[in-house]
Amino acid sequence: MLLDLNVESPERSGTSSSSVLNSGDAGGGGGGGGGGGLFRFDLLASSPDDDECSGEQHQLPAASGIVTRQLLPPPPPAAPSPAPAWQPPRRAAEDAALAQRPVVAKKTRRGPRSRSSQYRGVTFYRRTGRWESHIWDCGKQVYLGGFDTAHAAARAYDRAAIKFRGLEADINFNLSDYEDDLKQMRNWTKEEFVHILRRQSTGFARGSSKFRGVTLHKCGRWEARMGQLLGKKYIYLGLFDTEVEAARAYDRAAIRFNGREAVTNFEPASYNVDALPDAGNEAIVDGDLDLDLRISQPNARDSKSDVATTGLQLTCDSPESSNITVHQPMGSSPQWTVHHQSTPLPPQHQRLYPSHCLGFLPNLQERPMDRRPELGPMPFPTQAWQMQAPSHLPLLHAAASSGFSAGAGAGVAAATRRQPPFPADHPFYFPPTA
C-alpha cells in the first residue's frame, strides 16, 4: 500500500486529518468492485451519515499531477543598495532640471564679467550706492563716471568701447543703438570723449562733482585745483560756493597754463582767452615770493629797492676780519652822521645788524660818567668791551609773513634808543662816498 499525503479527498477537501489508503492490489478487498479500492479513515470528524456508509467503497479518480504548496512565508523584497558616502544623494527633480536647462552660447569676451553687474564694464559700489563705469586702455583703467542705474553705466561703457576699439568691440547692447553717437565721436579725441561721458554722468561716485578738477571740501564749499603742473602734486585754486564756479575757475586755469587745447568742463569759446594773464609771468612771480618764517636781511644786490650803501669799517681784534657794510634806506632818517671830511662822530640813534665779525660786540651796560677813566685812542677794542655785550641783540627787521605788528617793532626800537651810544673814544673809519 502507498500513503500519499499530497492528494486529498474530494468530499473532505477542507479536512487535514483524512488519510487515504491506496491498495495496489486490484483484486483484493471486499465489495467486488473493479478497479483500485480506496478506504478512508476519518478519525477526527465523523458524522452519522458517514458512519452508516463507512464501509462503503468509493472510487476516486487518479491524481493527474503533483501539487507543491509553500509552507513558509515568502522572503521580503531586497532593499536597494545605499549610495557610497563620498557621493552626495541627487534628487530626481534636480536631475530633471539639469536635463531641461538650455545650453546658452557664450559670447567671446576679452575679460571676465563684472562681479556685481550683468553688464560689462559696470561695477556697483555699496559705499556710495552708485554704478560706476570703467574701461581698460593700454593697461590703465579709465574712469567714465558714476550713474544711478546699471543700464546708463553700461551705455557709457559701450560708447567708450566703440571709440577706443572700433566697431568690433564687445559691447553690452546692439551696435545699431549708437548710430548717432558714431557720427559725433569721429571729431573728438579719446580724452575729450571721456570727459564728455563724465559730464553726462550724474556725478562722480568717489568724489562729489561731475566736473573736472572740482571736489567737495570738508567745510561744505567746492574746491578747485589742478594736478601735476610745474612739478607740483596739485595747485590749489580756491573755494567756491557752487561747483559751477569752481569748474569755471579750473577751466580758466587750464586755458592759462595749457593754452587753447586744454581739456575744460565747458566750451573754451565761452572764455576770453586773450584777457587771461600769461602763465609764464605768474610762474616767475611765484618763484620769487618767499614766505618762509624767518628774519629778512637787507639785500645789497636788490635792484628794485632804493637803498644807499654807506661804508662802515670797524677794526676788530682778528687780523682776518673783513669790512662790514650797513645798508640804510634813503627815505629813513640818517642814523650815522657822515661828513664829507670823513670825521668820526658818535651816533645819535643806533641800529644794529648781525655781523660775522666777532669783535663787533658793543658794551650796553650803564656806567657813571665820572668814574670812567680818560683813555686815549685805542687801536683795538678792549677785552671788557667785547665780553660784556649781551648774548642776543634786538633785531628790528621781521619777516613779511611772520604776523608781528608794527607796535612790537616800535617798542623794541624805543628800548634800543634808551641805551647809551657807543664810546666816543672808539675809532671809526668812514671811507669817502663816491
Swiss-Prot record:
Find motif (Nuclear localization signal) and give its ranges. 106-115
An annotated GO cellular component? nucleus
One Pfam family assigned to this protein is AP2
Gene Ontology process terms (BP): regulation of DNA-templated transcription; regulation of flower development; regulation of seed development; vegetative to reproductive phase transition of meristem
Deletion consequences: Delayed transition from spikelet meristems to floral meristems and altered floral architecture. The snb osids1 double mutant, lacking both SNB and IDS1, exhibits a decreased number of branches and spikelets within a panicle, as well as a strongly delayed transition to a floral meristem, associated with abnormal spatio-temporal expression of B- and E-function floral organ identity genes in the lodicules and of spikelet meristem genes.
DNA-binding region ranges: 118-174, 210-267
What residue spans carry the Pro residues bias annotation? Answer: 72-87
- The listed location of motif EAR is 291-295
Looking up SMART domains in the UniProt record yields:
AP2
**Name of the molecule in the record:** APETALA2-like protein 2
